[in-house]
Structure formats: structure tokens, C-alpha cells
Curated annotation (Swiss-Prot):
It catalyses: [phosphatase 2A protein]-C-terminal L-leucine methyl ester + H2O = [phosphatase 2A protein]-C-terminal L-leucine + methanol + H(+). Keywords: Hydrolase, Serine esterase. The lineage of its organism: Eukaryota, Fungi, Dikarya, Ascomycota, Pezizomycotina. GO terms for molecular function: protein C-terminal methylesterase activity. Residues 1-69, 181-203 are annotated as: Disordered. Its EC number is 3.1.1.89. Belongs to the AB hydrolase superfamily. Residues 44-69 have a biased composition (Low complexity). The active site is at S240, D266, H412. This is Protein phosphatase methylesterase 1. Demethylates proteins that have been reversibly carboxymethylated. Demethylates the phosphatase PP2A catalytic subunit. Signal peptide: none annotated. It comes from the Eukaryota. InterPro entries: AB_hydrolase_1 (IPR000073), AB_hydrolase_fold (IPR029058), PPase_methylesterase_euk (IPR016812).
Length: 454
């Protein structure tokens, strides 16, 4: 309010108090001098009525806007953020998503299909898997994780699939050297197949052919354990390394007509081979351990390795274990980086030492694109970006040899970052390849036998 207005208001109030007519506001042709500092003070002051001005049509009225929140003087305005205070990093148990867990033991012996080490010492392997059984004639989605992950990588996805296809089943295994699957040296004493020799286990074989054979064995052992008369219709789903494994199994046609199709998540031969060149550099920058399981989950979310906190809270517990547990002889199939870390500052370590798997990297991905296009069954490729396509797959996609879906907003772990969208794509893929929905026309011979004209 200008000085002239103040004088007029004072005179008006005084005349009213004395019962005199109100004075007219003087008219002046001289405008008061504009003072920018005074104007700013007036604009910053409270609005009439003592209430702060609030315009709901303005973005400034949003709760997230700094214009509507006036902090107290003692509040640290420029303090460093302390993370997601309201976001829980508590682990989510596997029972939230799966019906049961299976420990499937493959005995050592010449007729049992057991593996042998380079020194021809028989080994015994106990596969660990998570299962939700299919209902009726529902399909079974069999999933295989990538290197360094576990079967829990597909936990949240399995729940989303069941929401859209309630009769579907999901079988998610831990590959050898991952999760809770263990390989031991079998006893040489007859009748003691469940015991170990007490010696160090043989070197772990992570070749592509072995992993594909493991996947087939897990499917067969699950059928036996669940007393299924026959295999349900199967959709194979593999992420990264798992994509190469399911492609290898599909190309072998060992599952026969039970296999409806296979889906590969974010792995392409050319892109994978290029990425291997920088893998050791990436591993050297990754933390060697964590102070707690919650810290491990928090790191995966903050580093955007996994962009969905619910997925991280579910899958990360399958990647880490206390140092004491990793030092058990039956779990030392791979060097796990425990040496020289006797302190307890970061007792939670990676279950799988990815650097030690380097001898197998090239074997996993060489020829992947060709095998993917040649294998029988429906084919689908889910990518986080079209730049990942190599020449062979680009030509195949133009020829309509497989279905392609791209999620540019996802990271490498597509199924964990976007479980809902991935589930929608997989359920739609199953429906397109579901043979039970096919309606075939009647045979001519049957029509003639019924006396109908053809």
C-alpha cells in the first residue's frame, strides 16, 4: 500500500469515528515512485484474510512443489538425501509367490544320467527349484535365470502370469553353481550314494550342453516327484544365459510335442559377445560383499541393476549368503571370493563368483541367433532396446520367423523391472501357440461315413 493510500485510509476511519461523512480519496496525477524491493515484500507477504495464496490450477499447488511447503527455520534445506526412508528393503519370502520348493536329487551312477568331472570322478547333484503346479490342462512355464541370478528372479513374474492365466504353472530352477543347487563328489562306497568323500568337489561344469541337460533333467524329475502322468504343455522362458539354455534345449527337441514355444529375454549373440569384453571391468566395480541383506537389496535398487524394488526384495536373497554358509564344502563348487575376507564388516557375499565362470562365456552365446531361428516351436524375443538386434535376427524378424517385443524403459532384467508387461507378453504368446484351442475341420472320410455329401 502506498503512502498516499495509507493517509486516505487513516482519514476515512477517523471521520467515521466522529460521525462525519467519509473523505474522498484525493486524486493525483502523479504516480508514486515504483520500488521493486517494496513490491517484492508485498508479494511475499500473506494474502488478505491471513491465508496463503493457493491456486489449484497451478503446478505450484502440488504437494511435490517446493512453493507450497514452507520449511521451519531449523530444517536443513540442503542436506544430502538419506535414501528412500519410506521404502522398505525387507526381504520378501519365496512363499509369497510359489506353491512349494523342490530338492531333486540325481544319483551318481552309470545309468542315472549323472555328470562326471574332468577326472572321471562321479558326482551327485541336488537340483533346487520353485514350483507352482498347473491346474487341469494348464501350461507350465519353465524358467531359467541368467548367470549369477537364481530361480527367484522369476518370482514376481510368476505371480503376474497367474493373475492373467490362473490355470498356468511355473517351474523356476536354480542352475548348478547358483542359488541352492549343489554338486557333490559321490561316495565310492556302494550303498553310500548320499554321502560325500570329504574331498573337495570336482570342478563345476557350466558348459551350455550341461546346463541344457540339467534343465531337461529338472523337468523330468519334477514330473516324477509330482506324479504327473504326462508333461503339461510347456513354454520355456530364459533370461540372458538362460535364453541360450532354453534355445539349446528347444533345438534338441528332447521335450517332443510337449514344447509349445520358447521365449528369450534380452540376449542376442552379437550384443552378448560384445558385452563380454567389458564384463571383468564391471565385476571389478561391483561390491564384494554387504553388511546386511537389506544393504544388498538397497544396492541393487540404487544402482538400478534391478529397477523394481519389489522384485529386488524377492530375488536378491537368492544371490547372497553369509560367509559361514559359503565355506561349507558342498557349496564350494566355484571360487566365491571369500579368501582374505575374514572380517565381519561385510559378511554377506555373492553365492556365485561370476569372474570364475569366464572360461564358459563364449560357449554360451556362439551360434545363438542361428539356433534360435532354427529350433522348433513358437519363438519370441523380448528386448530392452532394438539396438541389441544383430543382422541375423533383424533379417529373421523381417521374415516373420519370430515375435519381437521391445521394452525401452526396462534395464537388462526385463522380467524384474516390468513383471506385468512381461507377463502380458508371455500369456499372449502362449495363447497364440496353444494347440488345445485349435478347431480342425472334420475329415472327409468321417463326413462320408455319416452319409453326408461332400
Amino acid at each position: 500500500m502506498s503512502e498516499l493510500q495509507k493517509q486516505w485510509a487513516k482519514a476515512r476511519l477517523g471521520s467515521q469515528a466522529l460521525g462525519q461523512p467519509p473523505a474522498e480519496m484525493p486524486i493525483t496525477t502523479t504516480m508514486p515512485e515504483f520500488n521493486e524491493a517494496d513490491e517484492d515484500k508485498e508479494m511475499a507477504g500473506p494474502s488478505p484474510g491471513g491465508f496463503p495464496f493457493d491456486d489449484d490450477s497451478s503446478s505450484a499447488s502440488s504437494v511435490s512443489s517446493t512453493g507450497t511447503v514452507i520449511p521451519s527455520p531449523g530444517r536443513a534445506l540442503f542436506a544430502r538425501p538419506q535414501g528412500f526412508a519410506s521404502r522398505s528393503m525387507d526381504p520378501i519370502p519365496w512363499t509369497t509367490y510359489f506353491e512349494r520348493e523342490l530338492f531333486l536329487k540325481e544319483e551318481a551312477g552309470p545309468d542315472s544320467g549323472s555328470r562326471t568331472s574332468n577326472k572321471n570322478k562321479p558326482t551327485s547333484i541336488t537340483y533346487h527349484a520353485y514350483l507352482t503346479s498347473p491346474v487341469g490342462k494348464g501350461p507350465l512355464f519353465v524358467t531359467h535365470h541368467g548367470a549369477g541370478s537364481s530361480g527367484l528372479s522369476f518370482a514376481v513374474l510368476s505371480s503376474e502370469i497367474r493373475k492373467r492365466l490362473p490355470n498356468a504353472g511355473i517351474l523356476s530352477l536354480d542352475a548348478r553353481g547358483h542359488g541352492s543347487t549343489t554338486v557333490t563328489a559321490a561316495s565310492s562306497v556302494p550303498g553310500e550314494g548320499d554321502e560325500t568323500t570329504g574331498q573337495a568337489p570336482p570342478p563345476l561344469d557350466l558348459s551350455l550342453s550341461t546346463l541344457a541337460s540339467d534343465l531337461f533333467t529338472v523337468i523330468q524329475l519334477t514330473r516324477t516327484a509330482m506324479h504327473w502322468p504326462e508333461l503339461p504343455p510347456i513354454i520355456l522362458v530364459g533370461h540372458s544365459l538362460g535364453g541360450a539354455v532354453v534355445t539349446e534345449l528347444a533345438k534338441s527337441y528332447r521335450l517332443g510335442p510337449s514344447l509349445l514355444g520358447y521365449a528369450v529375454l534380452d540376449v542376442v549373440e552379437g550384443c552378448a559377445m560384445d558385452a563380454l569384453q567389458s564384463m571383468q571391468t564391471y565385476l571389478s566395480t561391483r561390491p564384494q560383499g554387504f553388511a546386511s541383506l537389506k544393504d544388498g537389496i538397497d544396492w541393487h535398487v540404487r544402482s538400478r541393476t534391478i529397477r523394481n524394488s519389489t522384485s529386488a526384495r524377492t530375488s536378491v536373497p537368492g544371490l547372497l549368503a553369509p560367509v559361514e554358509e559359503l565355506q561349507r564344502p558342498e557349496l564350494q563348487q566355484l571360487p566365491r571370493g571369500v579368501a582374505g575376507t575374514q572380517g565381519t564388516a561385510k559378511p554377506w557375499r555373492w553365492k556365485t563368483d561370476l569372474a570364475a565362470t569366464q572360461p564358459f562365456w563364449e560357449d554360451w552365446f556362439v551360434g545363438l541367433s542361428k539356433k534360435f531361428l532354427e529350433a522348433r516351436g513358437g519363438k519370441m524375443l523380448l528386448l530392452a532396446g532394438t539396438d541389441r538386434l544383430d543382422t541375423e535376427l533383424t533379417i529373421g524378424q523381417m521374415q516373420g520367423k519370430y515375435a519381437l517385443q521391445v521394452f525401452p524403459e526396462a534395464g537388462h532384467f526385463i522380467h524384474e523391472d516390468l513383471p506385468e508387461k512381461t507377463a502380458i507378453a508371455l500369456v499372449d504368446f502362449h495363447r497364440r501357440n496353444d494347440r488345445s484351442q485349435l478347431v480342425l475341420p472334420p475329415k472327409v472320410s468321417d463326413l462320408l461315413a455319416q452319409g453326408k455329401k461332400v
